[in-house]
């Protein structure tokens, strides 16, 4: 018989840096999950994505076991890294804080494609171009 799903948790944790302190510890502890087991598994799975915040979806079962799925880093993090900036513009219409090329945009779109609600790379590029525009990042040819 299949295990009964009790809850699905969504967290954003820095890659390779999950530890029992907040927000991870309290979120998992109150659901009876072995926190250290999750931290070790998450850190092992995300060690090659250091420097990014990784969205993770944790499925908790009735017998206190769990599974988790890691997603790609947020589009904003990927765009900031491609543009070489620390943060987006506070006024994106007036202040442009960085530039990325269409090739860089395509690279980010290919990385983010599994998490977007499209299968077309051109459509994914349009979605990410909108995010870049709202961050004050200019797209050049």
Curated annotation (Swiss-Prot):
Top-rank lineage group of the source organism: Bacteria
SUPFAM superfamilies on file: Ribosomal L11/L12e N-terminal domain (SSF54747), Ribosomal protein L11, C-terminal domain (SSF46906)
PTM characteristics: One or more lysine residues are methylated.
The keyword Signal appears for this protein: no
Any GO BP: translation
Coiled-coil intervals, chain numbering: none
Gene Ontology MF terms: large ribosomal subunit rRNA binding; structural constituent of ribosome
Stored InterPro entries: Ribosomal_uL11, Ribosomal_uL11_bac-typ, Ribosomal_uL11_C, Ribosomal_uL11_C_sf, Ribosomal_uL11_CS, Ribosomal_uL11_N, Ribosomal_uL11_N_sf
Record's keyword terms, sorted: Methylation, Ribonucleoprotein, Ribosomal protein, RNA-binding, rRNA-binding
A GO-annotated cellular component: cytosolic large ribosomal subunit
Similarity comment text for this entry: Belongs to the universal ribosomal protein uL11 family.
Function of the protein: Forms part of the ribosomal stalk which helps the ribosome interact with GTP-bound translation factors.
Quaternary organization: Part of the ribosomal stalk of the 50S ribosomal subunit. Interacts with L10 and the large rRNA to form the base of the stalk. L10 forms an elongated spine to which L12 dimers bind in a sequential fashion forming a multimeric L10(L12)X complex.
PANTHER family: 60S RIBOSOMAL PROTEIN L12, LARGE RIBOSOMAL SUBUNIT PROTEIN UL11M
Protein name: Large ribosomal subunit protein uL11
Species of provenance: Nautilia profundicola (strain ATCC BAA-1463 / DSM 18972 / AmH)
Gene name for this UniProt entry: rplK
């Amino acid at each position: 018989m299949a295990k009964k799903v009790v809850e699905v948790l969504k967290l954003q944790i820095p890659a390779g840096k999950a530890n029992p302190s907040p927000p991870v510890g309290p979120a998992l502890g109150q659901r009876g999950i072995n926190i250290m087991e999750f931290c070790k598994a998450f850190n092992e799975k995300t060690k090659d994505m250091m420097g990014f915040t990784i969205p993770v979806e944790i499925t908790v079962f009735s017998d206190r076991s769990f599974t988790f799925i890691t997603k790609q880093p947020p589009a904003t993090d990927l765009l900031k890294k491609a543009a070489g900036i620390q943060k987006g513009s506070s006024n994106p219409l007036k202040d442009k804080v960085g530039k990325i090329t269409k090739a860089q945009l395509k690279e980010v779109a290919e990385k983010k494609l599994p998490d977007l609600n499209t299968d077309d790379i051109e459509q994914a590029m349009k979605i990410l171009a909108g995010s870049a525009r709202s961050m004050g990042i200019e797209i050049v040819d």
